[in-house]
């Protein structure tokens, strides 16, 4: 039986293993024939969605890995808009709304309210938090 998963990532791209472990879990789930419809980045996890993260050449680029996984498997990548704004991760729409000249939300990520997380909790067979 194939299950539909949603993931919640609370850890930042670097300084914590949460995002890396969530990514590895996602790969394993997909390899077993299940699907992931949404990854919701919350609290410090929104830092995974910054286009300004520049890891060293010998380090894993977890943001790029999330982007590629999402493209290959049609997974929604959402950040909590309130948590993102507090941490300086700004989408184009929010930049315009707040009259900012720049935005730095990485390609493939969308900003959403906690309603996005609530939807995941109700729609999916499993929701796993990292």
Curated annotation (Swiss-Prot):
Gene3D superfamilies noted in UniProt: DsrEFH-like (3.40.1260.10)
Annotated S-S bridges: none
Native source organism of the sequence: Aliivibrio fischeri (strain ATCC 700601 / ES114) (Vibrio fischeri)
CC annotations in GO: sulfurtransferase complex
NCBIfam families (UniProt xref): PRK00207.1, sulf_tusD_dsrE
Chief place where the protein resides: cytoplasm
Entry keyword set: Cytoplasm, Transferase
Protein name from the UniProt record: Sulfurtransferase TusD homolog
MF GO annotations: sulfur carrier activity; sulfurtransferase activity
Protein encoded by which gene: tusD
Known role: Could be part of a sulfur-relay system.
Domain of life: Bacteria
């Amino acid at each position: 039986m194939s299950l539909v998963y949603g993931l919640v990532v609370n850890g930042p791209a670097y300084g914590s293993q949460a995002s890396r472990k969530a990514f590895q879990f996602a790969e394993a789930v997909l390899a077993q024939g299940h699907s992931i419809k949404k990854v919701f980045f919350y609290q410090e996890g929104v830092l995974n969605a910054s286009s300004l993260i520049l890891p060293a050449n010998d380090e894993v680029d977890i943001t790029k890995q999330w982007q590629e996984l999402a493209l290959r498997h049609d997974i929604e990548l959402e950040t909590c808009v309130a948590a993102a704004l507090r941490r300086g991760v700004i989408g184009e729409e929010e930049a315009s709304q707040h009259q900012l000249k720049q935005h730095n939300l990485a390609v493939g990520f969308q900003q959403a309210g906690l309603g996005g997380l609530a939807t995941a909790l109700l729609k999916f067979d499993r929701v796993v938090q990292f």
